[in-house]
Amino acid sequence: METQKYQPNNKVRVVTAASLFDGHDAAINIMRRVIQGTGCEVIHLGHDKSAEEVVNCAIQEDANAIALTSYQGGHNEYFKYIYDLLREKNSPQIKIFGGGGGVILPEEIKDLMEYGIDRIYSPDDGREMGLQGMIDDLVQKSDFATGENITVSDIENIKFEDAKSIAQVISAVENFSDEKPELVEALKEKAKHFNIPIIGITGTGGAGKSSLTDELVRRFLRANADKKIAIISVDPRSEE
């Protein structure tokens, strides 16, 4: 049965991963491709990822949502810890979605969603909604613009060590540059006071961009322990 894909109205970023001590990555690999095909940017971390890794990535990317699979039996603690970490790190706006087939029992799904997890999809959901239907539900719930509350005063509070503040300003410029021209001008003015070299690395998929960047950064930091370097990555498949 053909279903009409939900089309997001905003730029939606979703961090995907399989849980810690979990090598079952087939499901999340399918899900992430469908999420991407529904119009979202996907940051995929792979399998065997800790709650801390997932949450830190979501904050650094200023993501709208986290989508996880958990088939190793520790889902109750794992999902709740991610929920708690997001609030501990002052990022409660990031939504949490997950699934684990028959491993997550109906009463556990109920408990997790009452705890605050936005949605745990069950095998029954898969049968009733279909794969695209579940992803449409996830994307629709995550369809909001990030960076809306950032103002000029926030630019003065940017710290190199604070990835969250940097990510939020990037989101604000990406999503609200027309509505907030003063924000863009303030950033341009601030940039005038710095003489920092900028190196761009580009190439087709599989050309070795990440490997080259990794090697350059490693050598730079080994030779300059007191220096700092920032890396901004852009999805090469982006249409913009």
Tell where the protein language model's regions lie, with residue ranges:
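Hydrophobic anchor at the beta1->P-loop junction of P-loop NTPases
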Residues: 199-201
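Conserved glycine(s) of the Walker
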Residues: 208
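Cofactor-cradling patches in redox/metallo enzymes
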Residues: 21, 28-133
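Non-catalytic signal-transmission and effector/linker regions of two-component phosphorelay proteins
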Residues: 1-12
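Conserved small/polar residues in nucleotide/adenosyl-binding loops
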Residues: 240
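The conserved Walker
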Residues: 20, 205
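Extreme N-terminal, non-catalytic leader segments
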Residues: 131-197
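A conserved segment at the C-terminal end of the G1
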Residues: 211-227, 231
